[in-house]
């Protein structure tokens, strides 16, 4: 039998959570055509995998690379850590459909969409552009409720009125029909903070009509986190819609240990409704600079400041001392800005990671030189630190949480598993050396231990370098 490429003598972790096997994998065109003992097969190229692990390409279900897919299509930050598929449009903010004519976009949309290129008034226009100018990774996109509010609601400081809500519903219905894989909300952020629970339910009902998900950055992840989770579950129940909670965390010193309450809430809800969650493997979060958040953190690093670009990478406390002022005043001067907030407790991070239903995500945004290390290092951090060094769960379980689990949850057909007939999205890595190279001091450092990455049958990353292939495709949600 003939194949384009045969991976030989690999430890195959297939993404299902089952015990690894030793064997070979053959690919032809963009598909896996055989798995097992393939000594009688011949390949145009043989890849010796002795001592290495072959896994499905990792799937990142929560990124903010909506614009970067077009402006930085090589996607080094993703390929270098083994990611072959991403889901954008999270936290209520997608860059399409965007019909608002204002020059300065409300944050955080203004941090996600920064170029002067023409805006995409229809979601179909954005997808068509991605098809015409492919990126190096596969992509799917949620439709942001916050973006719809910016388009339709005259005063973002109040709930939508009946006419505005109807306009948002119509726009969402169209965008989902054009390939959006669900709706996302970011009720935590100013453009959507005034939205009522009923408004969110209305969005979820449109998603349900399309057989798609309601994905949410909840209204609060700190002092009101339990109430916000209750609201999220209510939205799912009332809309009869599947709910996915993004980057679940317990933020703020007063809320450390709260995962002992929230995780049982998830378990109980899962008995009666369709609920899932993802999380990141870090004790620091990253979002817009705001006073409420910095007061809950033990340390804040400025990731980016449009007003003072040279302050990126520095501690907020050091900047305040240099300016001879308090933290609040320093923060106000830096705005608009983003920060890295050391705000979670390691025990909560481990507890949430080890929860059997948790999917892994990065919550990364590819901007600037001082971003959070999660942009480049999330998935190797899980497999290196939490799997190999800490033993939080097995390698097979870790890979499952970043492959088949997100693929199944978001309806990415034939992705996330090494099996005959599946797409040839693959990552070859050394389990003894894999780890994040990114740190808070040097966040744009590629991961260690990633040998090769293949996207749809094409080698896209090898030995620390981008191969220049743009093999990514635009994905839809499979309703089955």
Residue ranges with predicted function:
Residues 71-181, 273, 282:
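Divalent-metal coordination cores built from histidine and acidic residues
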Residues 96-102, 150-156, 197, 226-230, ...:
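Short acidic, glycine/serine/threonine-rich loops at helix termini
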Residues 53-77:
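Di-metal (Zn2+ and/or Mg2+/Mn2+) metal-binding site signature of metallo-dependent hydrolases
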Residues 351-357, 362-363, 378, 427-475:
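C-terminal cap of metal-dependent C-N hydrolases
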Residues 125-126, 159-185, 191-334, 340-359:
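Histidine/acidic residue-rich metal-binding segments in metalloenzymes
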Residues 10, 25, 30, 51, ...:
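Divalent metal-coordination and catalytic microenvironments
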Residues 237, 293-329, 333, 344, ...:
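His/Asp/Glu-enriched, well-ordered alpha-helical/loop segment
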Residues 1-6, 11-57, 72, 436-439:
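Histidine-rich, glycine-flanked metal-binding segment
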């Amino acid at each position: 039998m003939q194949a384009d490429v045969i991976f030989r003598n690999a430890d195959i972790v297939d993404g299902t959570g089952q015990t690894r096997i030793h064997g070979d994998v053959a690919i032809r065109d963009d598909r896996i055509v055989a798995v097992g003992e393939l000594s009688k097969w011949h390949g145009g190229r043989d890849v010796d995998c002795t001592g290495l692990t072959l896994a499905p390409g990792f799937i990142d279900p929560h990124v903010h690379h909506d614009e970067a897919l077009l402006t930085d299509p090589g996607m080094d930050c993703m390929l270098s850590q083994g990611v072959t598929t991403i889901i954008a449009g999270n936290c209520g903010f997608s860059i399409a459909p965007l019909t608002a004519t204002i020059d300065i976009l409300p944050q955080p949309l203004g941090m996600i969409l920064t170029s002067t290129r023409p805006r995409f008034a229809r979601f179909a226009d954005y997808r068509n552009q991605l098809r015409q100018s492919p990126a190096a990774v596969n992509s799917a996109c949620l439709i942001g409720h916050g973006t719809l509010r910016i388009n339709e609601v005259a005063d973002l400081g109040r709930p939508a009125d009946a006419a505005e809500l109807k306009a948002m519903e119509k726009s969402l219905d169209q965008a989902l029909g054009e390939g959006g894989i669900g709706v996302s909300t970011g009720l935590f952020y100013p453009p959507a903070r005034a939205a009522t629970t009923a408004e969110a339910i209305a969005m979820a009902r449109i998603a349900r009509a399309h057989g798609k998900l309601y994905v949410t950055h909840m209204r609060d992840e700190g002092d009101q986190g339990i109430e916000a989770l209750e609201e999220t579950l209510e939205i799912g129940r009332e809309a009869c819609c599947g709910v996915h909670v993004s980057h679940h965390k317990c933020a703020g010193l007063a809320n450390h240990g709260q995962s002992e309450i929230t995780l049982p809430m998830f378990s109980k809800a899962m008995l009666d409704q369709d609920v899932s969650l993802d999380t990141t493997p870090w004790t620091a979060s990253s979002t817009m600079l705001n006073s409420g958040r910095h007061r809950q953190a033990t340390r804040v690093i400025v990731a980016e400041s449009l007003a003072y670009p040279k302050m990126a990478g520095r501690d907020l406390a050091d900047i305040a001392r240099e300016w001879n002022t308090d933290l609040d005043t320093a923060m106000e001067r830096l705005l608009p800005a983003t920060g890295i907030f050391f705000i979670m407790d390691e025990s909560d991070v481990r507890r949430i990671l080890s929860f059997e239903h948790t999917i892994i995500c990065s919550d990364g945004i590819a901007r600037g030189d001082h971003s959070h290390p999660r942009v480049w290092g999330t998935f190797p951090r899980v497999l290196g630190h939490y799997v190999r060094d800490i033993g939080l769960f097995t390698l097979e379980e870790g890979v499952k949480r970043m492959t088949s689990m997100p693929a199944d949850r978001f309806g990415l057909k034939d992705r996330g598993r090494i099996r005959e007939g599946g797409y040839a999205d693959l990552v070859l890595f050394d389990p003894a050396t894999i780890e994040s190279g990114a740190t808070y001091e040097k966040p744009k450092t590629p991961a260690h231990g990633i040998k090769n990455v293949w996207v749809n049958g094409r080698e896209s990353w090898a030995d620390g370098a981008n191969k220049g292939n743009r093999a990514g495709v635009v994905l839809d949600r499979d309703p089955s």
